[in-house]
């Protein structure tokens, strides 16, 4: 990536300016992730920043939901034995690779996390030293909120870095 001057800068409490160099885009299997990826990638390009796409493999029961094709990703075979964590990792890796190809930028990295989505995102953001986390926020029904929690609100509550929220609807 070049070293052009970016209009995006963050000021901390001491009024010290720093340039954002790393953008972490967290996505799930929901088709609205396309909007999140596109918005996050556009933001990163404006900042001349490095990009990593992240997906977290969490409760396998959540993955029983079927979605239509988006960004070239055709979903997964419903006959997959979702109890096999190896198979879930393979499905998730394939998903991340497909989404990265959608961006047509070989410099885009991918990261697969495990466990609680918010915790995994926060942990990787800290390890990678992300300058901004990009998330989508979409409404779940009441039962989904009780079972899954709201990842975006948990990340916002516990993050040490700025969060760029992309509002999306199902």
List PLM regions with ranges.
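Gly/Ser-rich helix-loop-strand patches that form or flank binding pockets
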Residues: 5-9, 123-170
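General small-molecule cofactor/ligand-binding pocket signal
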Residues: 54, 109-113, 164
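A short acidic, glycine-rich active-site loop
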Residues: 73-91
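Small/aliphatic-rich secondary-structure junction motif
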Residues: 14-78, 105
